[in-house]
UniProtKB/Swiss-Prot annotation:
<keyword id="KW-0963">Cytoplasm</keyword>
<feature type="DNA-binding region" description="H-T-H motif">
    <location>
        <begin position="21"/>
        <end position="40"/>
    </location>
</feature>
<dbReference type="GO" id="GO:0005737">
    <property type="term" value="C:cytoplasm"/>
</dbReference>
<dbReference type="GO" id="GO:0000976">
    <property type="term" value="F:transcription cis-regulatory region binding"/>
</dbReference>
<feature type="domain" description="HTH lysR-type">
    <location>
        <begin position="4"/>
        <end position="61"/>
    </location>
</feature>
<dbReference type="InterPro" id="IPR036390">
    <property type="entry name" value="WH_DNA-bd_sf"/>
</dbReference>
<dbReference type="GO" id="GO:0003700">
    <property type="term" value="F:DNA-binding transcription factor activity"/>
</dbReference>
<protein>
    <recommendedName>
        <fullName>HTH-type transcriptional activator CmpR</fullName>
    </recommendedName>
</protein>
<comment type="function">
    <text>Activates transcription of the cmpABCD operon under carbon dioxide-limited conditions.</text>
</comment>
<keyword id="KW-0805">Transcription regulation</keyword>
<keyword id="KW-0238">DNA-binding</keyword>
<dbReference type="Pfam" id="PF00126">
    <property type="entry name" value="HTH_1"/>
</dbReference>
<comment type="similarity">
    <text>Belongs to the LysR transcriptional regulatory family.</text>
</comment>
<dbReference type="Pfam" id="PF03466">
    <property type="entry name" value="LysR_substrate"/>
</dbReference>
<dbReference type="InterPro" id="IPR000847">
    <property type="entry name" value="Tscrpt_reg_HTH_LysR"/>
</dbReference>
<keyword id="KW-0804">Transcription</keyword>
<dbReference type="InterPro" id="IPR005119">
    <property type="entry name" value="LysR_subst-bd"/>
</dbReference>
Amino acid sequence: MKNLTLHQLKVFEAAARHSSFTRAAEELYLTQPTVSIQVKQLTKAVGLPLFEQIGKRLYLTEAGRQLYKTTRQVFEQLEQLDMTIADLQGMKQGQLRLAVITTAKYFIPRLIGPFCQRYPGINVSLKVTNHEGLINRINDNLDDLYVLSRPPSGFDITVQPFLDNPLVVVGPASHPLANQRGISLERLAQEPFILRERGSGTREATEQLFAAHNLNLNVKLDLGSNEAIKQAILGGLGLAVLSYHTLTSAGATPELKMFEVEGFPIHRQWHAVYPAGKQLSTVAATFLDYLLTESQRIAADIQIPESTTTDPELDAPQPVVGV
């Protein structure tokens, strides 16, 4: 493989990641024939087929999978070298790849903004996705850091909690229960509920709480986004359990109200996660340190609701449950 080039590897990495020569060409601002030529030359240098086409889909061969894994490691090391040199020169610059669960979008931008002002040489790539999408990104090692409330089981990962994530009951301000205090779970179980999709940490925590009291949730609808759930609440379809962060700052909606229910809020935390043993880049390590410090500023700005339950076991922080 003496004749391969970094440019060929860059083209191959994009084609493998997208499973498409066309999308790779679009990303790299190249023509599709150019991508095909670069991959063909790389294939010749390797001496084994890198792709196989079945129907209209493009798949990596075993040689292609091994090369893709190695190629990503090569580019990660080159990025790390750039950051290390910049750090030695007294500068912080480079690329931060950050992936977060959808609910984190209500507070993460408030952290990224000041971070970028402090370190103008750092560019941030932020991906927002649901729980399943984030797990896939962790599995594929696509990012530097991941932010979610429920770290997955079955992964060898480093987990760093940094901010409380209380889950609260939300409903229309006009609802008959809106101004009541100490609403029982038994009474709440009579109401229709709108929940996040299956696999969501918020949904699982809610189902666990009701199951612990031998109560069934009346699930009227499940939706894949917090904003869709808010609109469904306003449409009179039911109540919901949401992260308190969705009701603060940019997520605030005057027509919605947090209900005072026994057993709520459910105590969870936000976690920064990355593969165990992974050497964080200078930029990623800088952001993680910043996250642990500045998250306390956000916590101070948010008045976290107190639990209304008299059961100390329910009032205690709940353990993180795996996927």
